[in-house]
Regions:
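Small-molecule kinase domains that catalyze NTP-dependent phosphoryl transfer to phosphate-bearing small molecules
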Residues: 117-160, 168
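Glycine-rich phosphate-binding loop used to anchor ATP phosphates in small-molecule kinases
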Residues: 53-96
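Hydrophobic anchor at the beta1->P-loop junction of P-loop NTPases
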Residues: 8
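Pre-Walker A (Motif I) flank of P-loop NTPase domains
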Residues: 2-5, 71
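Conserved phosphate-donor/acceptor-positioning beta-strand/loop module used by diverse small-molecule
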Residues: 95-115
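P-loop (Walker A) phosphate-binding loop of NTP-binding proteins
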Residues: 11
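ATP-binding Walker
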Residues: 14
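Conserved substrate/cofactor phosphate-moiety recognition/catalytic segment
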Residues: 17-63
């Protein structure tokens, strides 16, 4: 069986991490990677050097995950609002795995509720809402499968994505 790399992208607060972790419970053996783990700099800094560091770290982890004989599914979640970033990360990985790219979408109202809840809980910075809503405009033109998270639980999303993965594996 060919391995599968499932890439979940979308704005902050749309539900990538929660749905991705649920997905790992449905597709086994699997491993979960959040791109944010590779950019947990203190203080946070966006420079050419830090961008290169993060990209190199993510590519290395994805390759190692796909090379592991004990892993059939790699679930990778990250904001990925720029198509060039996604292309650079995934370059050459199609030789190691079937790649399924999915953008999780939400209405501005739904996204605002989720991000505000995270801000109130101290899980996100106060400016996260503004950035998350601004990033919404980058996703409609991406050549990915789009799934709405509005009114859906992470379990429902994970069930749908697992079904898509299984259907593609059979075709």
């Amino acid at each position: 069986m060919m391995k599968t790399l499932i890439v979940l992208n979308g704005p902050m607060g749309v539900g990538k991490t929660t749905a991705g972790k649920e997905l790992c419970r449905r597709l086994t053996p699997s491993i979960f990677l959040d791109g944010d783990w590779c950019w947990d700099l203190h203080p946070f800094s966006v420079t050419d050097a830090t961008k290169a560091l993060v990209m190199d770290n993510i590519r290395a982890l994805l390759r190692r995950d796909l090379d592991c004989a004990e892993v059939d599914y790699v679930v990778f979640v990250w904001v990925l609002q720029q198509e060039e970033t996604a292309a650079a990360l995934l370059d050459g990985l199609d030789e190691k795995a079937r790649i399924l790219r999915i953008t999780l979408d939400a209405s501005d109202e739904s996204l605002s509720r989720r991000v505000q809840k995270d801000i109130a809980a101290g899980l996100r910075a106060p400016d996260s809402l503004e950035r998350s809503l601004a990033y919404q405009r980058f996703y409609p033109g991406q050549g990915t499968l789009h799934l709405s998270t509005d009114g859906r639980s992470p379990a429902e999303l994970a069930d749908e994505i697992a079904g898509l993965v299984r259907n593609r594996a059979e075709s």
